[in-house]
Amino acid sequence: MTIRTRFAPSPTGYIHLGNVRTALYTYLVARAHQGDFILRIEDTDQARFVEGAEEMILETLNWLGLNWDEGPTLNNPKEESGNFGPYHQTDRRDIYIKWAKKMISEGLAYADPYTPEEVQVFRDKAKAEKRAFLYRDHRPENPPEWQLGMPLRFKVPEIKRYSWEDAVMGELSAGPEALDDFILIKADGLPTYNFAHIIDDFEMQVTHVIRGSEYIASTPKYLSLYEALKITPPILAHVPHIMAPSGNKKLGKRDGAKSVTEYRSEGILPEAMLNFLAQLGWNDGTEQEIFSKAELIEKFSLDRVQKSGARFDEQRLIWLNGQWIRSLSLDDLYSRCQSFWGEEAKNADESYKKRVLELAQDRLKTLQDLPKLTSYFFVEPEIDTELIDGNKQLRKLTDDERQELLSITRQEFEKITDWTPETIQNCLNQLLETTGQRPGILFSLVRIVTR
């Protein structure tokens, strides 16, 4: 059997770190078993649709090297590749309608005849009686014939407790309280997530569904629908939340969470981001900290994913990034730095910039650090004249005399090929002899212009 996994984001905004980690785990499971990694766009929530979000999702996955086998094409998402499309849910309406009609014919679904006002009356009554509102308590005895423009609801056939084996969490179970007659097709003719993802996963022959632990509570109603449709569920794996640095809540924007796009613009390498995200909730049981994508594919398994939330630590990401920067060849690093050089370096000679980069490589933590670490290689340093004017001995020299001393000093220092304390000391002694100046004058000037 071919292992087939899917990542199914919604184009409703930027793709946050939790989603990207899910995409990574989904990708690794497929690649570890020489399987297929599917990208499906769940775009049925048109009210929250954000223009350009899909393109950003595709570009993020591409930058991280999470190449997909089926789904929208990178340069033109409207074009798709794969034998199980369409891969946009809004293009799969006919498929959902076919399944909906099948369910109606089998007595598994019914048209919802109630107005929102009528439903609110039901809710208010349940609240007044201090009981949970359940739609199944208000099933119409003779529902109208369903047609587009009317919501269609699942008629849950059996109210019972469900148990299942989760590939990450182990044995789980949840009871009847989660089961109700949920909507399959909305009034706008588009399916709900609860319905569409089950149909899509079945039609696309998905074998593993990897998603966040927030979906555990809804799993019984999914299992109820699988059972009603006589579909064998795929292997389910619910991964823990990424937690805020405090460790007591889910990571959010208020905790400094950024999008992958923001981290990319700050000079985080894709290798470091993958390395970091993989270890947010997973380890291979060793002390190894640096993992290439190939090593992750080789070593990753769902049974090594932890059950509890993983604490977000941005400083660790930055540390990993520094390690990856130091591992790159000079040519590779140079090619990645093109948009990060300071303005003063834009027109500098390439060979000179590479020499500068070689000196800075071990000190870079992010590519964004490049300008502040290298700017002085491209601009003449400004001499603080106030320091000179405040020195009693240097005030005795004219501007021309100071410039001549600096010129001679520079010439002598440029002759040094082996920079050691001894060679520097010898150079300074030679300068004293050449210029005839006292140490107090010459060394004070050298200290000021090199500080």
Could you tell me what each predicted segment is?
Residues 52, 56, 95-98, 217-221, ...:
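Generic recognition of stable, solvent-exposed alpha-helical segments in well-folded globular domains
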Residues 15-17, 263-271, 307-313, 346-356, ...:
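Structural motif
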